[in-house]
From Swiss-Prot:
This is Vicianin hydrolase. The active site is at E204, E416. One of its GO terms (biological process) is carbohydrate catabolic process. Hydrolyzes the disaccharide glycosides vicianin, pNP beta-primeveroside, 2-phenylethyl beta-primeveroside and furcatin. Coiled coil: none annotated. Disulfide bonds join C223-C230. It comes from the Eukaryota. InterPro entries: Glyco_hydro_1, Glyco_hydro_1_AS, Glyco_hydro_1_N_CS, Glycoside_hydrolase_SF. A beta-D-glucoside binds at Q56, H158, N203, E204, Y346, E416, W465, E472, W473, F481. Belongs to the glycosyl hydrolase 1 family. Expressed at high levels in seeds, at moderate levels in flowers and at low levels in roots, stems and leaves. Keywords: Disulfide bond, Glycoprotein, Glycosidase, Hydrolase, Signal. Residues 1-19 form the signal peptide.
């Protein structure tokens, strides 16, 4: 075998050692990796990382003192809402395998590992008594990341609200959550902030508010009867109330960090937002306005208050008194409440103007736009195994340019970007590892992102999603987002997909 092939298989060899998988297969052809497009073209201080989240990967859901989150309850009470009726009780068992997983991240040549802290692992009831074993676990994870020469990029809230707070006051439907979130953040900053310099308060508040309260497909599973199969909820108001309290929770935690910790810990804090980019369905003025309005509703809903202290005018006009208002004090608290913005980007949709309706209101009628990846039956880009994800890498350039032009060119980290494949246990692992679609997805998005940087967008890092196959929320274990294959049928053994080897080559490891 040639030296170059041996070089390519260093990761596979490591995986064989740390996961006990024996001799790795060597069917990967080196031509897959022959590329002049690599890390060296990006700014010297640019971070390349990979991500995960607590409920998706940790497992160990009811051991070592962790309290239940709303996702534990949701998957238990509504298994019919999960595609394969599963839960994150085991995930990818990161709780017991974090050392070997972090070693793989290092071996790939990445700079940083993004993960989230389970609020109910630290505070089993959301507040009050601290769980020392939970505190110890994250100390161990952070220390292991640093010991491997990696940078921890840590999210405080990735959708797994402690069930106790949902029971006590309906969670983010109540403004009481703001103080509890601030206290949780305070403890985490105090405990880990000597080593963690990149903090994300919230991951995708849009998804939490929309899927949890508009359609009811995410925990806590609330929506109007006309919008989905939910016992309780109001799709016309609750998503906006929840979003408002998420924004205020972020702002409170960010202010706390900046006033109490930042000067001596010398870290940065931000929030991670998610959006599609939107192209007008036609060149008509109405469709151009609809595309702009859709971006306001998906992205500006959070980016506008965090930057300017108020909601986008298009939302105010559409929603009237259904949209909560910020007090003068809240405007000051929220405005400019970040050092950076994280952005999760996967796809771009068309937006076509639609009339505003006053019956059976939902987020999607409020937008006054029909949003779809299809135009006259033709997709905006190649379809994938995930029904909403169509490949459109140009959108990442358009999005970071939009942030530069509309939101004062903030420091940006792409905190998620990736593609899923359907889980198919009937094909051999040697075949399942061949994920050419993922290689081309990352390669093309990075090319458009680099162009965005050259055009002046202040992007400082790119985190692929995700490290390993894991629990994909309402899709359960039916989809694989990882660059590392997890064998759910054989003790969760890890195998590198071709994308992991491509990434290693891209990173000049």
């Amino acid at each position: 075998i040639s030296p170059s092939l041996l070089y390519l298989f260093s990761l596979a060899t490591l995986l064989a050692v740390v996961t006990g998988t024996g001799t790795p297969s060597q069917e990967v052809h080196p031509s897959h990796y022959a590329t002049t497009f690599n890390k060296s073209l990006f700014p010297k201080d640019f971070l390349f990382g990979i991500g995960s989240s607590a409920y998706q990967v940790e497992g160990a859901s009811n051991i070592d003192g962790r309290g239940p989150s709303i996702w534990d309850t949701f998957t238990k009470q509504h298994p019919e809402k999960i595609w394969d009726h599963s839960s994150g009780n085991i995930g990818a068992d990161f709780y017991h395998r974090y050392k070997s997983d972090i070693k793989i991240v290092k071996e790939i040549g990445l700079d940083s590992y993004r993960f989230s802290i389970s609020w109910s692992r630290i505070f089993p009831k959301g507040k009050g008594e601290v769980n020392p074993l939970g505190v110890k676990f994250y100390n161990n994870v952070i220390n292991e990341i640093l010991a491997n020469g990696l940078i921890p990029f840590v999210t405080l809230f990735h959708w797994d609200l402690p069930q106790s707070l949902e029971d006590e006051y309906k969670g983010f439907l109540s403004s009481k959550v703001v103080k509890d979130f601030e206290n949780y953040a305070d403890f985490v900053f105090k405990t880990y902030g000597d080593r963690v310099k990149h903090w994300v308060t919230l991951n995708e508040p849009f998804s939490y508010a929309l899927y949890g309260y508009n359609g009811g497909t995410f925990a806590p599973g609330r929506c109007s009867k006309y919008a989905g199969n939910c016992e309780y909820g109001d799709s016309s108001t609750e998503p906006y109330i929840v979003a408002h309290n998420l924004i205020l929770s972020h702002a409170a935690a960010a202010k706390l960090y900046k006033t109490k910790y930042q000067a001596h810990q010398k870290g940065n804090i931000g929030a991670t937002l998610v959006t599609h980019y939107f192209e007008p369905h036609s060149n008509s003025a109405a469709d151009r306005v609809a595309a702009s309005r859709a971006l306001d509703f998906f992205f500006g809903w959070f980016a506008h208050p965090l930057t300017y202290g108020h909601y986008p005018q298009s939302m105010i006009s559409s929603l009237g008194n259904r949209l909560p208002k910020f007090s003068k004090e809240e405007v000051e608290l929220t405005k400019g409440s970040y050092d950076f913005l994280g952005v999760n980007y996967y796809s771009t949709y068309y937006a076509q103007s639609a009339p505003l309706t006053t019956v059976n209101r939902t987020f999607y009628t409020d937008i006054q736009a029909n949003v779809s990846p299809l135009k006259n039956g033709a997709p905006i880009g190649p379809a994938t195994d995930l029904n909403w994800l169509y490949v459109y890498p140009k959108g990442i350039h358009s999005l970071v340019t939009h942030m530069k032009d509309v939101y004062k060119n903030p420091i940006v980290y792409i905190t998620e970007n990736g593609v899923a494949q359907s889980r198919n246990d009937s094909i051999p692992i040697s075949e399942a590892r061949k994920d050419g679609i993922r290689i081309s997805y990352h390669d093309n998005h990075l090319k458009f992102l680099l162009q965005g940087i050259k055009d002046g967008a202040n992007v400082k890092g790119y985190y692929a999603w995700s490290f390993s196959d894991s629990y994909e929320w309402d899709a359960g274990y039916t989809l694989r987002f990882g660059i590392i294959y997890v064998d759910f049928k054989d003790n969760l053994r890890r195998y590198p997909k071709y994308s992991a080897l491509w990434l290693q080559k891209f990173l000049l490891k």
